[in-house]
């Protein structure tokens, strides 16, 4: 992948720089965050890999959405220890990168996405954190095949070999893609997520596989035993619904 994505492509690279500038222009971070690292990470990624389109992951909507998510996670959890954070459908790792720029007490972040290209790009963008005892590590994994009680993990190493299997507890699970699959409510949330697990869930309106018409419908779909945040974000003609709490 490295050879393919590092091929010269001036038009794509210029487009990526424009996308990154739009993304950075719409970040609204709280005083507890520092976005200098995400600026450098995007700059280095675009310079090193000009032949990949990042527009699906780095855009105005994601910038505003991720800022909202992070601000409220910081507000809810402050300096409480969060342990291992699982980001489902994490794409190229932008949300994870922004979370690690905060003062949240995160042990490490696992960026899960079924798209293998995302794993490569995420690990490249976060290479310093990958080398830091896997403070960040992307994996190609189906969210329906994760054990959310205690997950047993094998990851592909840089030399193409597979690591020894190890176990970890996903203490905080972030899913910003509740509207992107039709079977999330019952097959995933109800059946797979253990009680007392910390959750951050986001659904949305619009042209997605499972659109939620309003906040009330989204709330009913994902009941929690202890709700710590419930809110709505409007970006252009789309609304996002978010719940933070304990299942």
Regions found by a protein language model. Name each.
Residues 114-118:
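Conserved SAM/SAH-binding beta-strand->alpha-helix loop
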Residues 107-112:
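Short beta-strand element of Class I
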Residues 80-93:
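Conserved class I S-adenosyl-L-methionine
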Residues 2-81, 121-168:
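S-adenosyl-L-methionine
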């Amino acid at each position: 992948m490295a050879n393919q994505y590092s091929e010269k492509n001036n038009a794509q690279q210029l487009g990526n720089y424009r996308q990154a500038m739009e993304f950075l222009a719409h970040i609204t971070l709280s005083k507890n965050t520092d976005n200098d690292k995400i600026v450098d990470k995007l700059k280095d990624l675009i310079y090193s890999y000009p032949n990949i389109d990042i527009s699906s992951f780095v855009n105005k909507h994601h910038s505003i959405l991720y800022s909202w998510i992070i601000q409220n996670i910081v507000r809810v959890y402050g300096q409480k220890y969060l342990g291992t954070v699982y980001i489902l459908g994490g794409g190229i790792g932008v949300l994870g990168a922004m979370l690690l720029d905060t003062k949240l007490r995160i042990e490490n972040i696992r960026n899960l996405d079924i798209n293998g290209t995302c794993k490569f790009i995420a690990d490249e963008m976060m290479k310093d954190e990958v080398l830091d005892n896997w403070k960040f590590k992307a994996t190609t994994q189906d969210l329906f095949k994760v054990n959310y009680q205690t997950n047993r993990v094998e990851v592909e190493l840089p030399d193409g070999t597979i690591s020894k299997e190890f176990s970890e507890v996903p203490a905080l699970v972030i899913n910003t893609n509740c509207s992107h699959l039709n079977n999330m409510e019952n097959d995933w949330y109800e059946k797979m997520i253990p009680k007392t697990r910390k959750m951050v869930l986001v659904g949305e309106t619009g042209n997605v596989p499972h659109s939620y018409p309003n906040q009330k419908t989204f709330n009913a779909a994902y009941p929690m035993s202890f709700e710590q945040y419930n809110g709505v974000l409007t970006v252009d003609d789309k609304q996002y619904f978010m719940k933070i709490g304990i299942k």
